Design a protein with these regions (language model features):
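One-carbon transfer enzymes
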Residues: 1-176, 206, 219-222, 228-230, ...
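C-terminal accessory region of SF2 helicases/translocases
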Residues: 167-168, 173-253
Length: 253
């Protein structure tokens, strides 16, 4: 029998009672966001297994998918971990790797990792029941923390290299959305690519239906999809049809 639940808190005995009364063999945790108290970890016969969206111990914490893309990692994966009181510190039960594509967004990578995690946990549980799994401790020397993403972190700094900003746009798609300012109004960028061009950081070098080319601290970005405050996501051609944007305009001011 499988019981699904997402309690807002497990601090109280009343909140933990349904888990205790289920007399479960194992509890599987995915994208829960809270550290489980030891009283909960001790309830299932085989403990609690977390499906974590990174190759632990790299990217422990709340935002492993976004951090992997921001860092330019070429691969990530799923770690099935025996949960303990620390934050993503428990021994590893299984691991599966996945390449990060050059145009990968946090949204697309999340979906691929979710599918991979589902397959891996289904494969693990019978082995766990049979006593065939040998937990492997994490190497603390390799631990990297994936801090929670804040809105201000999604603000584009045009002084940075184009490749770094492109990763930022992909990492924050769909949430919270990488953003800049145009004429005092917030502007979110959803799809960009690095391109040739040289100019001042944030300067519009070219504005055509094929894309809006913007200078960066190193190189340039071609903006392909964007969204003004209160509007919808549109391609460059649709945006320019409704907005006068000429070379020389500056983003970020």
């Amino acid at each position: 029998m499988c019981i699904r639940d997402r309690p807002e808190s497990l601090r109280s005995e009343a909140a933990r009672r349904p888990i205790a009364e289920a007399h479960g063999d194992v509890m599987v945790v995915a994208a829960y966001g809270l550290i489980l108290p030891q009283a909960v970890l001790d309830l299932p016969r085989w403990g609690c297994v977390n499906i974590h969206a990174s190759l632990l111990p790299r990217w422990r914490g709340a935002a492993p998918i976004q951090r992997a893309i921001l860092a330019g990692d070429e691969e990530t994966g799923i770690t099935l971990m025996q949960m303990e009181a620390g934050l993503d510190t428990g021994p590893i039960l299984a691991m599966a790797r996945l390449p990060i594509g050059p145009e990968e967004t946090a949204g697309s990578l999340h979906d691929r990792l979710a599918a991979l995690g589902a397959r891996e946990i289904v494969a693990l549980l019978p082995r766990l029941a049979a006593g065939e799994v040998v937990p492997q401790p994490q190497d603390e020397r390799l631990a990297v923390y994936a801090a929670k993403i804040g809105k201000e972190e999604a603000r584009i700094d045009w002084q940075r290299p184009a490749a770094q900003i492109a990763r930022q746009v992909r990492a924050f798609n769909p949430h919270p959305g990488a953003w800049t300012v145009l004429d005092g109004q917030l502007l979110k960028l959803w799809q960009v690519r690095c391109c040739e061009g040289q100019g001042q950081p944030g300067e519009v070098l070219q504005a055509s239906p094929a894309g809006i080319v913007v200078g960066c601290g190193e190189g340039a970005l071609c903006v392909l999809e964007l969204q003004k405050a209160g509007g919808r996501r549109v391609d460059a051609a649709a945006f320019l049809a409704g907005h006068a944007l000429a070379p020389g305009a500056v983003l970020g001011e």
